[in-house]
Amino acid sequence: MRDALFAYSPKGSNNLYELAALGEKTYFIDCPTRIGIYRINDTDVCLIDSGNNPDAGKKVLALCNEKGWKITHIINTHAHADHNGGNAIIQKRTGCRILANCYEQCMITHPRLNNCCTFGGRTPMELDNKFMLAESSASEQITDENIPEGLSFRLFPGHSFDQIAVMCDDGTIFTGDILCGKSTIEKYHIFFIRDAAEYEHSAKEICETEAKVWCAAHYPPIYSKDELCELARLNIEKMHELLNVIKEICADGKIFEDILKETLDHYGLELSFNQYAIAGSTVRGFLSYLHDIGEIAVDIKNNYLMWRNCDGETN
């Protein structure tokens, strides 16, 4: 999800769905949500994510058929619809196994849970679209035993509940949405974060990994540790900027809808329904985080839930 809506778009439509090499065994398919490929052997491959909709799945199937490759596995970094939109059609045509982690695995099998988590309840029909709601696919909990040989995984939550990165034995790491791309940050300022504390921790942790290349879903591959760490720094810096903006907005106590509006106005944003739901989820999560660390208080007045900055208060 969610970076498909606040996201990098591949430059040059002629390059869409072309195969590009990363390492000795790894490739990516350039498309709105990049699809990773790990070559298990001469005939079998594992996908890392499956694209943002069924059409992406069809194009990946055609490409793999052309190469003589059989898709035996899909590993989803997380459950957002832009990362598993091709799951169902690929699984129907190949019988491949789909592996994901904990909550992500559950939400891939039951995708409406994902939208409920974002919106905070049953979603209106306008949000039941291909950008927000993937078709259900049968997924399994990923383990060290069922992941294809040559691959491993590691937990990097924050953007989503139980997002993982996929580590390949040729030095490639597929990072999903652990970090947001620079162009998206500069254009939209607000990007999807489920948990601020976990997001910052994961941004720092990915900088501790060793790889030849880090391949994310929504921005070009990174081949330099310094470049990766600079992007992580930018993500953390922007997140804290947004937290401070929200704190300032809450100086006199405000309801959520006013906080969200003033945050969007601060950055000069006018959003679609999809984007509004996503930005709203991020801002709600930030309010909860600020409350839990004691920087924002919650009051109920006249049946309004008010969020109020605690600066200057003493116990």
What spans do the regions from the language model cover?
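Conserved beta-strand hairpin/beta-sheet module of binuclear metal-dependent hydrolase folds
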Residues: 12-67, 165-176
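Divalent metal-coordination and catalytic microenvironments
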Residues: 25, 38, 49, 78, ...
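Active-site HxH/HxHxD metal-binding segment of metal-dependent hydrolases
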Residues: 26, 54-147
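Short, glycine/acidic-enriched loop or turn micro-motifs at the edges of active sites
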Residues: 33, 42, 52-53, 81, ...
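Residue-level marker for buried hydrophobic side chains located in beta-strands
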Residues: 46, 75, 98, 172-174, ...
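Metallo-beta-lactamase
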Residues: 52, 152-240
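Positively charged, polyanion-binding regions of nucleic-acid-associated proteins
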Residues: 236-254
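C-terminal regulatory/interaction regions
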Residues: 248-315
